[in-house]
Amino acid sequence: MNGNKHLLGFDYAYHISKLLFEQLEELVTGALESMKTGTVTDSFEKLIFAAIAITGIVSGICKGSNQCAIAHKFYEECRSFFYENTLNFLHGELVAVGLLVRLSYFGSDCAYMINELTTLKLPKCLSELNIPTDAVEKFADELCNSSAINDTSDISRKRMLDALEIIKK
């Protein structure tokens, strides 16, 4: 724990998120099988509960601090500017690609996330979302102008363009 009373919630949110991620990893295979067979299993119920309720708790603890704002703004830009292209994708699929951008923007290694998306047969790049790769310029502008970044300086734009390289295929 960092001891700063203003950041204490983030410490708790981090640990809850870590536990949530570990639980989701354990449950996802069984939940996907449950979905394929059309049966509601314990794994499926636990995964749905964790994904909705626990994520809501973490969000509440963080008081809307933009913890995944880049990922959600990416989703919004997909729906705003590439609606027809992304019509057949779920909210979570678009946010997952946005998470790659967020991880890259903050300097995290994306290999694990890319591997997980590949294993689950989920999109991980613009071409898999039916979005042209030259759209990175549009995404960079929109994301830098959004409440997620709110910095239109050349340095910020370059950092965002660099982050978007992870999904430019």
Residue ranges and their predicted role:
Residues 107-169:
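C-terminal charged capping/lid subdomain of soluble metabolic enzymes
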Residues 1-2, 20, 126:
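Long hydrophobic alpha-helical segments that form multi-pass transmembrane helix bundles
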Residues 5-116:
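Active-site segments that bind and position negatively charged phosphate/pyrophosphate groups
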